[in-house]
Amino acid sequence: MENKRVTDSLSTVQWFIFLLANAVALPIVIGGIFQLSFEQISTLMQRTFFVVGISSFIQGWLGHKYPIADGPAGSWVSIFVILGNLALIQGQDQMYALQILEGGLIVAGLVLFVLGTTGLVYRLQFLFTPLVSGSFLFILALQLSGVLVKGMLGLQGTSAEPDVMAALISFFIFGLVIFLSIKGRGWISSYAVLIGIGLGSALFAAFGKVEPTFTDSTPVLKFPHIFAWGVPQFDLGIVITSLLFTFLLVSNTISSISAVKQVVPVLPKDEKTALSRGIWTGGISHILAALFSTIGVVPLPASAGFMKLTGQKRIGPFLMACMLLTVIALMPSVVNVLALLPAPVASAALLATFVQIVGIAFQSLLQEQLDHRRLTILGITLLVSIGLMFLPPAVFQSLPSTLRYICSNGLLVGTILAMLLEQIWKAEKKISHYQKL
């Protein structure tokens, strides 16, 4: 009995660190993009931990019922980056841009809830072919790599001069995380990201790059603010963008469950049920993200790799870790320490994880033979989506809001384009030798 308690405790700690490592970096990156103050970043991190903990618990308890960690979605970050840059160029209040994003999260959440509860999600599965999924992951990695490299150089907001010392430390951490994830053994490989973040923060502190701004009035417990960015705003552009973006969120959930199925056995009859529950629960998670003004959270496919490496497949310790993260989020003094994480270090750690995403993208693309048809679709998709990324945000300034949000997002355009081409240009049916005779 005592051994079981020790094992459960260690398993809970491992899951807690995994949840924390995947939730801690993106709020720092978003804070840099929107030029948020330390207090704003700290409260954003608090709300992110709170939503990640609750969302992961709900998914494991009522949703797909697998130990799959929820975390801030990299795909949502692309939307945040685009609106943040547009607001900066147009001289708009960036808080208004964040209120529009709250509205987008609500729309996406409602659509996901309807798709999951009505079973309509099953009818959309034919759209998410290996070519579409691979293209989505590849474009996602490319689009966010630019944002993360800028963060590593210290180029956030209106800053035009790179911080040389920050860049040197960041690229060292980037290389270290990759090295540890490949060459590290046991727990070292499992926590390469966390080790990199810890060492990078220590180096920044040693070179005087971290300035603590704690106050004596920090309360012991504090519930996260509701609508901290203000009342959600809706316009036609964000509504249409969110409707299209839902396809990406469904694709993410399907990818996560498929990856975990390779680690945790599942009966075929349970697969559809798990998907529908995961989708409508994901809708609730997005509405919670809007309510608490944070980044949309999604099931993380990386959970499968963590489970395979550590052997942590039981749902009990996972649910306990989710509850622990939720409780930690109510303690501002703890969150303030985590908010001191330098943005360049967070960007470096995230960029290292995207190396694996590129590999997964290629694996998905190679699930089917890359014949002339698929190569052409892939080429068109990549050229158009990447070409849009190279255009300056000012190009889209004169467009109506609907077209502005869509056309300026290479990830969204590329994924929808791949879906359309896959359905319009049907693959030729192979005729066997006996059929010819």
Over which residues does each language-model region extend?
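Membrane-embedded helical hairpins/re-entrant loop segments and their flanking transmembrane helices
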Residues: G31-L62, L243-I315, K436
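Intrinsically disordered, low-complexity non-transmembrane regions of multi-pass membrane transporters
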Residues: M1-L10, F214-I226, Q262-D270, A274-G278, ...
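N-terminal signal-anchor module of multipass membrane proteins
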Residues: M1-P67, S78-G91
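Membrane helical hairpin/interfacial module
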Residues: S56-V121
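Hydrophobic, membrane-embedded alpha-helices of multi-pass small-molecule transporters
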Residues: S9-A23, P162-F174, Y191-A192, A206-F207, ...
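Interfacial segments of multi-pass membrane proteins
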Residues: V81-L86, S181, S303-F318, L324-I328
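Short, non-helical or kinked segments that cap or interrupt transmembrane helices
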Residues: H64-V77, Q125-S133, S189-L194, T294-S303, ...
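Membrane-embedded alpha-helical modules
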Residues: Q94-V210, C322, V327-Q435
